[in-house]
Amino acid sequence: MSDGDWRASIRWVVAHPTEPRVLLDRRGGGLALPAAERPGRVWTGDPAELLPSLHELLGADAVLLRCLEEDEDPTARRQRTTFLAVPRTAAPPPAGMAWLGRGELAAAAAGRDGDAALAARVAGELEDGHSGDGDRPWAARGWFDQAAAWLAASMERIGRPLTGPVRQVRVWELSCLLRAPTTGGDVWFKTNAASPLFVNEGVVMETLAGLLGDQVPAPLAVDAERGWMVLDDFGGDLGWEVPAEVVEEVPRSFARLQLRAAGHVERLLRAGCHDRRLERLAAQAEAWLPALEADGQLPAMDAATWLSQEELAALAAAVPRLLGACQELAGHAVPPSLVHGDLHLANVARGPRGPRFFDWTDACVAHPFLDLATIRRGTSFAGEEVEAELRLRLRDVYLAEWASFEPPDRLARAWELALPLGALHQAVSYRSIVARLQPPVDRHMAGSTAWWLRRVLADLPA
């Protein structure tokens, strides 16, 4: 069965633009949040898919702030979601609806966990000045208008004024993406959540573009203090279904980028790339993996994706081999360099002189071979899963660029050592991300930590 067999229920907690009140529907005799239904399922971070249903209810444009709740019933083929939004301008409520504050809502809720109770909680947060989320400022009322004004002013300064409205493209727990038309084509605004292993992406991309040229898009504008940047439209990503010969150019080009970056490690660190070299990864393995066995599970993990006790014990037992792999890999001549941290085909675009690499949120300095862990993960070419032969070709294309450092057999051994370490690097990254997420996204992303830890066990070298 396809998603077309599903039904999505969408509830809206609509906050007043300036007052600590929430919109409630009185037409049914009680108090209910505005709601809509639609066929299929919705992605909770896509304003273009979600906001039309709210526009039908309000008769006005609104800004999506965040997803508050999501659950699915596969048997009934039902998806239930709740979102927080705010109208672009203050206006009287639609017929049969009313703006209500915490006191009115609390009395109506009478201790029940229903629509009025949820609305009362949000109204209380607004009244107490807790609008938004410190890690994700775009969830606050008024943030969108500030960001849109900065974007417009930035484009005016470089002679490319906006020719239309700023639109939300993606709003979720990890980042916010806006788009706007200008006299020179569309531009993209991006900001990321505060997370311990995330970088100030605009600052880092300015540095990378200066050092590495066209392989990294240069931001048109950066607000370093607020973590905002604007990028030109560069035509979209490669996508997951492209011919193998196109994909082979990705590891080749990326290896050349890393070779150039290897001479600028201190500059990369000063720009804000995290230091995640092998000695740090070894320390994380030694401290974290045995603790996992003692805890018995991963925090914020959905029960279906918890590691088994046997897997946890195997990870703890693997620590000496992982430490040995770190030590042996450090003994190879390949130097530390720039690591992307999320290198896959959806973060690569076609450029005039070859692949261009974007989405540098996880950028760091580490062993360069760690990056190829993500290229191996479930990528499709022309609609078919990558076969072992093609993966070997991608490996060989990548390793050939490092031939000046080691003979082929030594490079192949370094690759073998790097596979479980790259998986561990990813597991550490996801652990850091999930620790700062709020429901319901934490439940969906937490499984990635377990996936990568299982990959550590699968890729351990002999």
Show where each model-derived region lies:
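Helical subdomain adjoining the active site within ATP-dependent kinase catalytic cores
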Residues: 425-462
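ATP-binding pocket architecture of kinase catalytic cores
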Residues: 32, 74-75, 79-111, 167-278, ...
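Active-site acidic catalytic loop and adjacent metal/ATP-binding pocket
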Residues: 167-183, 188-189, 219, 320-372
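Juxta-kinase regulatory segment immediately upstream of eukaryotic protein kinase catalytic domains
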Residues: 110-166
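A short coil-to-beta-strand element that immediately follows conserved catalytic motifs
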Residues: 60-70, 161-168
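Conserved Nudix-box catalytic region and its N-terminal flanking loop in Nudix hydrolases
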Residues: 6-61, 69-72
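Active-site activation/catalytic loop segments of kinase-like enzymes and analogous catalytic loops
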Residues: 355, 368-406, 420-439
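An alpha-helical support segment within catalytic cores of ATP-dependent transferases
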Residues: 142-161, 263-273, 277-339, 403-411
